[in-house]
Amino acid sequence: MRIRPLVALAVLIVLSACQSPRATAVHPAAQAPIPKPPPTLATAILRAAHLGPADWTTTVFLSFGLTARNQDQFAALLGSGRTVSPAEYAARFGPDPLLVQDAVSAVNAVGLKATWQPPSSVIAADGPAPAAASLLHVDIESYRLPDGTTFYATLEQPHLPPPLSAVTSNVSGLDDYRGARGYAVRPGGLWPVDVLSFYDIKPLRDAGLDGTGQTIMLPEIDDLPNLNDLDKFAAKFGLPAFGPLLTLKRDPNWGTPEKPQGETVLDLEIAHSVAPNAKLVVYFSAPDFGHGDRALDQLVTDHLGSIISESLGSCEPDTPSGARNVYASIQDRAIALGLSHFVASGDSGAYTCGLDQAPAGSFPSTLPTVTAVGGTSVFESQQGIYYKEYAWGSPIDQSGGGGGVSHFYAAPAYQKNELQAPSHGQRQVPDVAADSDPSTGFHIIFGGQDGQAGGTSAATPLWAATVALINQDLKQKGLREVGFANPALYWMGENSAKLNPAPFHDVVAGNNLYFNAAAGWDSATGWGSMDAAAMDAAWIRYIKGGGA
């Protein structure tokens, strides 16, 4: 299963400004079509030539998600908002090491090479496709698309034999189908000073909050061969050099990332603009769940920071249950350890799987244990200050902020008061939003060029970096860090009338090609974008007892 970067960088031609009586879109422009979602796996198989069973020269990269012990206690912990140390997690909820070693031995016995190191949530296993097919009782087939791309896949549900089934019930990596996307950029975009002003981040920065002592961790699938673009960006905007703050993590077991496409640069430049002294740690992997799960698992195990910014996703209904469940088991551990995890909700509006498919969300943003970040279009007044936002939705190029109803996950307790008619009691996304429209996007430097980028992958590091500033303030005041953000965010949204000023810019106009923005929470923009200074004050109140 492929994972897609959710960045929208498009070649644009700047036109004359089109003004309403009071406001203009930031840098209005006409744009070339944004790349559409790749076909679902089932559609790709129908279009592809069947090459027969994957043979012994085809290597598969499997990740088995380990089941936490004491499930009732673990569920109570996640629901309480409390956190545990890595050592306490291993002692109370981690898998039984002896049972895991039995499972590793069983996998090795069929001709795969399996490894596990505590406190990992994953058994990694590589080897010939026929060996994996035999172990899991599935047929793994090879295919070739019309463009010559080859991939392996199975549409069958795996059956895990004992002793594997004693410690895991899920596996990812049974296909390597992926849809890579290419991008270009155009001049313009919001400068860092605009972002600080529009989202009321400037008062936090003026108070000395710059991310010092915070670390943002980023799973990425497109490479960063050098720091040239980052160095130019920092120099242009008077920001600290990236070098002392940036760590790049690679491992052969995580596969090879794709060539640079702008996603990694976008994430890092936006995060650095908001929290310029926060450390940044990138975990590179190949763009499939088998490899990506391993990198994410190591990210959680390393626990180098308390914030994750993830701008990746796939069509939720098309994501195999094994891949979803392995990822979810890793994310459960992240929540228990107190990590905040922001995930882009997608750039195809309510149609993450394509306009020829039913509305659907983007996984993993649909997980109830992450904060899903949707998209807006920003408008400024004629005086150049923040005026309003609309839900991002462009029928011309069929793009917009991801949002809608999960097919698989029930609505969590924190969202019970926001359930809307189409939900049928299911999780709804996004939770929050920020500027994502490429026509009103962010100034970046990529490939040596000044350019403008959008997508919910731009809004996601903006949220992550803002929380880094809030965490810094909380720690200075002797309070706990944000951790899993959603209970607090929903408390703020539901009590916004009592919080003055309000912590959100409530977006009440526009749509994401299906769902309309409205007062309060909605499936186009969640609670809206942040007023960072007001949100910092609200978070302090929440943790001190106003809602915690």
Where do the language-model regions lie?
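Substrate-binding/charge-relay-adjacent region of secreted/lumenal peptidase catalytic domains
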Residues: V26-P119, A124, A129-A372, S399-T456, ...
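Bacterial signal peptide processing site
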Residues: Q19-P21
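An often Trp-containing, charged/polar helix-loop segment at the C-terminal end
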Residues: L419, N471-S523, G547
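Bacterial N-terminal signal peptides that target proteins for export
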Residues: M1-V7
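C-terminal motif of bacterial Sec signal peptides marking the signal peptidase cleavage site
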Residues: V14-A17
